[in-house]
A protein has these predicted regions:
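Non-catalytic, well-ordered alpha-helical scaffold segments
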Residues: 22, 132, 173, 177, ...
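Conserved ASCE/P-loop NTPase catalytic core
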Residues: 1-189
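Conserved AAA+ ATPase core "coupling" helix
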Residues: 87-89, 171-230
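Contiguous, well-ordered alpha-helical segments that form the cores/surfaces of helical PPI scaffolds
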Residues: 1-4, 263-273
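Phosphate/oxyanion-binding loops and surfaces in catalytic or ligand/nucleic-acid-binding neighborhoods
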Residues: 31, 35, 201-205, 291-295
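C-terminal engagement/docking regions of AAA+ P-loop ATPases
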Residues: 17, 23, 247-259, 270-324
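Conserved hydrophobic residue
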Residues: 9, 143, 203, 274, ...
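Conserved AAA+ ATPase small/helical "lid" subdomain
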Residues: 209-264
Length: 324
């Protein structure tokens, strides 16, 4: 859904070790269609969005130059836990400074992730200063760097994706609230599914080329479906009745702010586009509500029920299941 609408706000995936969280995120890169950027731009600037150009591209426009375009693969950039501030935000290119006596800015991970995905494995173990950097960039959509006499301002709009094991620590509330969706992944308990997983992994390790050939057709089908959904998503309609019920749901659950309603409506629209529908129905809303709200509810230490159970209870009242 985030691949269809980046405004959903990303996703955090929490679950036990070895459940395929990281594998699923890294596999996303091969599904994403290419985009256009300004030729040679280190910040992946969109030539059709003049208000979101880096300083270099703005200077070229002011000089009357035409911003040529080139296709590029949508990036899925991984942010390691031990990354430094310079690695994330960018820094002075020391090699050129020493050998050529010129000051050149070397883009960081935020620049590489612009118009793509920024992935953090074990996000709940992320250092506090990195969390603050991400919160600033996520809030403004820009990264401003002041280094050794260099001042650089460039766009940093990315979809934030995190994964982690809840047993290793909790995620800071400020960062958790920035994620649009929250997904729990559990270990597969069905015997046939476990056998299939082991068989696929064994096949891949023994003969990866044959395995890729076997899965190529299904992969191509997913790519085509994603492209069709991308063309359709902006035209999918959400009726006032559905929006009113979404708002009622959030009011009854005492959700703070309005990110809950916005996330549900955007995620439901993306899901409807994926299904090939022209408008959002109540089934779409039911499908995305728990993952949109379960990390936003106020926590009561005396409450014995899971947040997801509380959401489902109110959801059944506002959006009752229609049985035929």
């Amino acid at each position: 859904m985030n691949a269809l609408d980046s405004h959903i706000g990303g996703v955090v995936i929490m679950g036990h070790r070895g459940t395929g969280k990281s594998t699923a995120v890294r596999a996303l890169a091969d599904l994403l269609p290419s985009k256009n950027r300004v030729r040679g731009c280190l910040f992946n600037c969109d030539p059709d969005q003049e208000r979101e150009l880096c300083d270099n591209c703005k200077m070229d426009l002011q000089k009357g130059l035409t911003l040529e375009r080139e296709p590029f693969q949508v990036p899925v950039v991984e942010l390691p836990l031990g990354a430094t501030e310079d690695r994330v935000c960018g820094s002075l290119d020391l090699e050129k400074a020493l050998t050529q006596q010129i000051k050149v800015f070397e883009p960081g991970l935020l620049a590489r992730a612009h118009r793509g995905f920024l992935y953090i494995d074990e996000v709940n173990l992320l250092e506090d200063f990195l969390v603050d950097l991400l919160l600033d960039a996520a809030a403004s959509g820009w990264n401003q760097v002041e280094r050794e006499g260099i001042s650089v301002n460039h766009p940093a709009n990315f979809v934030l994706v995190g994964s982690g094991n809840p047993e290793e620590g909790e995620l800071r509330p400020q960062l958790l609230d920035r994620f649009g969706l929250f997904v729990r992944v559990t270990t597969v308990s069905n015997l046939d599914d476990r056998v299939k997983i082991v068989g696929n992994r064994d096949h891949f390790e023994r003969d990866p080329y044959t395995f890729f050939s076997k899965m190529n057709s299904a992969q191509k089908d997913l790519q085509k479906k994603l492209k069709r959904a991308l063309k359709r998503v902006t035209s999918v309609k959400v009726s006032q009745e559905v929006i009113r019920k979404i708002a009622e749901l959030c009011v009854r659950l005492q959700v703070d702010g309005h990110r809950g309603e916005l996330t549900i409506s955007r995620a439901a629209r993306a899901l409807a586009a994926w299904k090939g529908h022209e408008s959002v129905n109540e089934s779409d809303v039911r499908r995305v509500t728990v993952m949109s709200l379960q990390h936003r509810l106020r926590k009561d230490p005396l409450e014995q029920f899971e947040s997801s159970d509380q959401i489902k209870k109110i959801l059944d009242q506002v959006f009752p299941l229609v049985t035929k």
